[in-house]
Amino acid sequence: VDRLLGVAGKEDIFIVTNASQTEVMLSQTAGRVRKDHILAEPAARNTAACIGYAAVTIVKKYGDGIMCVVPSDPYIREEAVFQDTLREAVKAAEETDALVTIGIKPSFPSTGYGYIRSVEAEGKPYRRVEEFVEKPDEETAKAYLEAGCYAWNSGMFIWKASTILSYYKKLLPDIYDCLMQLAESFGTPREEEALWEIYPRIPKISVDYGIMERADHVLMLTGDFGWSDVGGWDAFDTLKDRDENQNLTVGKTLLLDSRNCTAYSVDKLIAAVGVSDLIIVQAGEAVLVCPQSEAQRVKEIVEALSEKGENSYL
């Protein structure tokens, strides 16, 4: 929220979160985000649903406007540079009516991010997107880095709210129909009831797969502001150095005869002996253990817990 307050006022910031997190979100953002701008999802339905929910809320309740979709988990080292890049993206969306994204200038051949291939737009600060590509293997990632025309997909998107809804109507009609049903209830006594009735029926698909990979007019601003997607535990390597045994530790930890492990403790002791290549995370009543090579699969655990209604562990 704080990094966005440098670009937008608190009257213009919306947060989409799971309904189980609403009270925590209200407490953490008090005085910085309007209470009625915290939109609670009754169920996790992937990014096309939550972004569409925010877009239809903006259009139906407040009229059209430029919408910036910014995930909450990335670490951004140079916030002033990020804000300048976001302003450029807003300007591009206003002038072109395109879908705009921010691609991160890659600093190493990551296999944990999707990539965006783009070409120059002569005389413009943005580039024209030619293709979104899946997370590559190591050799392909090295080739992308050497090619110079690939960027990491940050998941940040900028567009007119009405423009993105027109793409929902064209490319994701089932989701669009659900959003229109929700919109009909806005401002009525049935608004909350309709949300809980309709939202869980929205098809689960990401906005990347559903729209961005299929849209015909996508532009990209290149971001070079110290971005790291700490939604993945392997990204901690970009934030802190490993010790002489290649272990990375945060919090109360004790690793004996162990190598190449990541141990992160919030408030309890993590102790391990004779292990290697593991990620061990403790937070509250939950403990995560997985091989370093499987770090990108943590989201599968999140999805499984969400489907079982175990949101208290998330």
Q: For each of these PLM feature ranges, what is it?
A:
Residues 54, 73, 116, 160, ...:
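Residue-level signal for inorganic ion chemistry
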Residues 14, 67, 156-157, 228, ...:
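A residue-level structural signature of the nucleotidyltransferase/glycosyltransferase Rossmann-like core
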